[in-house]
Amino acid sequence: MRKILYYALACCVALFASSVNIYADDDDSDSFGARLSGEVDYKIMKGMHVYASEELRFFGGSDFIDRSYSELGFSYKINDHLKAAVSYTAIAVNKKEVIMPDNEEITLQWTEWRHRVSADLTASVKVGQWRFSLRERIQGTYKMRELNNYQQPQMGWVLRSRLKVAYKFRSVPFEPYAYFEPRLLLNGAKWSEESLGKNYENASFLGHKDVYFNRYRCAAGLEWKLNKRNSLDFYMLYDHLYDKEIDARKEGSIKGVVLKAPIHGISSDRLSLGVAYKYSF
């Protein structure tokens, strides 16, 4: 079994490296990415677990880690159908910019930190070999860098609702699954109706109370239970992101904050290949 585990891990590393290289060679590499993560899960007592995980995300080239997620969490299985969890995540977002002072190319790199807290409740039901689940997660993310609060809040709150279906084979240690998850922004920057038309300069800021769906995520994957303690998860993840582009600036002490352009929506799509390893004890 140990040889199988080593072989599986080697295949994962090779698959991950090849996928990142493919993305790096693509002209639109920001639309593709790869994720590599590891998790340690400790069973305190029946139904009660504490876990720690680290995830690396790659976009725009194999030589650059776009961001990393360091998470510590606690989960409790209330009964056969309900599970609750809370977690804290430190997020490091790596940035780089190329400047040309005196016709000399210089690459600047820096890290922006974010702090995230979340609480979720998962309801699940088994029908034969099928398992259906719905997870509701409330999540808050605090950005450390200075922000224009008339464009976005310092602490963003979202509600993530994940609907998942999985099938567990009787004779083989594989579990294919798929899920769909919309994300509802709860406190976006809200402006008056004039912000959408020709009279945008007369729009007024109404506070952080704009509510709209700003992300849709779906994935398909295969979980491989290597043995009692070790498991691997291979998945393909599609992300559709939507946001409102707000250009608000303060002009003088009398006029206050004004919009420099009408508010409009922007969207982007990303496709990621992921490999996750989990050790339970």
PLM regions with names:
Residues 22-26, 48-62, 67, 84-92, ...:
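Transmembrane beta-strand segments that form the barrel wall of outer-membrane beta-barrel proteins
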Residues 37, 71, 118-120, 160-164, ...:
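Membrane-embedded beta-strand positions in outer-membrane beta-barrel channels/transporters
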Residues 44-46, 73, 78-80, 122-129, ...:
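Outer-membrane beta-barrel proteins
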Residues 121, 267-281:
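Outer-membrane beta-barrel "beta-signal"
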Residues 137-255, 279-281:
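Outer-membrane beta-barrel transmembrane domain signature
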